[in-house]
């Protein structure tokens, strides 16, 4: 048996663009992807902190150190430029693997620069 666990998270990223006329996906700064352990074409869940929307899409790599967080295609209707979002990916692990696993959690500032990188998330410890 396997269970689904949080693998990677980019917390409170700022949407820099919403491009309705592009073919699907979310474009993420490649540097942020690397630090958060998110791969190109990986499925991610997006949560918009400002409007409460939750949806899934896949990742394409943006220019390194650009700070780009761009929702493309139909997903562009779910956010607005300037919205704060949480980007999460998941993995399937056995119970034994899950008990030893820690996610990669990346906190960014208003310009999508890395503020903190951790391998845990505990209630009340990190805002």
Curated annotation (Swiss-Prot):
Location (main, coarse): cytoplasm
**How would you summarize the oligomeric state and partners of this protein?**
Heterooctamer of four alpha and four beta subunits.
> Which reaction(s) does the protein catalyse, per the Swiss-Prot or TrEMBL entry?
L-aspartate + H(+) = beta-alanine + CO2
The GO terms describing molecular function are: aspartate 1-decarboxylase activity
* UniProt EC number: 4.1.1.11
**Active site per UniProt:** 25, 58
Name-wise, this protein is Aspartate 1-decarboxylase
For the keyword Ribosomal protein, the answer is no
Record's HAMAP family?
Answer: PanD (MF_00446)
Modified positions (Pyruvic acid (Ser)) are: 25
């Amino acid at each position: 048996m396997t269970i689904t666990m949080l693998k990677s998270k980019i917390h409170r990223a700022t949407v820099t663009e919403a491009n309705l006329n592009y073919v699907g996906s979310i474009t993420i700064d490649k540097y942020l992807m690397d630090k958060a352990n998110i791969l190109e074409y990986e499925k991610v869940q997006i949560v918009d902190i400002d409007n409460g929307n939750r949806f899934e899409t896949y990742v394409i790599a943006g220019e390194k150190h650009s700070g780009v967080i761009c929702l493309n295609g139909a997903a562009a209707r779910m956010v607005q430029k300037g919205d704060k979002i949480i980007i999460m990916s998941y993995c399937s692990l056995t119970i034994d693997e899950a008990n030893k696993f820690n996610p990669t959690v990346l906190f960014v500032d208003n310009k999508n620069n890395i503020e903190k990188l951790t391998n845990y998330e505990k209630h009340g410890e990190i805002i």
